């Protein structure tokens, strides 16, 4: 879907005095949609945590999700505020933030779907600059990680609530005609961002970002067995190591430049640091001018 369509679907302004509001377009509209998503996500996670009285781990995960969404909202620059906090007399305020799904499985799927929505936009150099892609991509990947953590705690699949999430999306679309903004996930049913790493394209060979990512994946793969021994908490280290080596081979066969070294060292071997290093290498590809490289980075990031 084109950015024009996406921007038009970001939110509908109230019919009364709508023309008095400044017009959002381009990345400004996309950014505000992402910010509204985080605001809705934080509010719903807080509400769900308050009622999760029979599951302490669930409540804790939900509060963490709410805190993460709030942090991402701030990193995105907050909600659009054209009037500086006080709406002038006779002028219209931006539409209220629509609510996120109330059912946990639908909420988790909604988090994941809105994340891939934003990641697809970030992966398209025709829609986002390098800096815009980094900003939007960071929010999208953080939201996807929140969805994955909640799915793990609740023991459900990310896609378990897809149908319910789409139903909520349809209801919000209908309400948007009355001045409520839409989540637009229905526009991204056929996402170009794949959770399967299969890069292709003529730009891969010249991409310094992909080459650096390959080196990072390879170094992490060779360090994981040692990390498992030293940390004692990485039970899947060997499996992840094998998957990373397969990814390295896939990238090299697709044309990535090989800058691996026979010896490499990582500053930290704990799970959080290793994961952070991987995601940083993946996300760096979103700053590329090549759609092929950005798509490779987005796919790798979803996997990691």
Region annotations inferred by a language model:
Residues 11-15:
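C-terminal motif of bacterial Sec signal peptides marking the signal peptidase cleavage site
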Residues 1-8:
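Sec-dependent N-terminal signal peptides
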Residues 17-304:
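All-alpha RGS (Regulator of G-protein Signaling) helical domain and cognate RGS-like helical scaffolds
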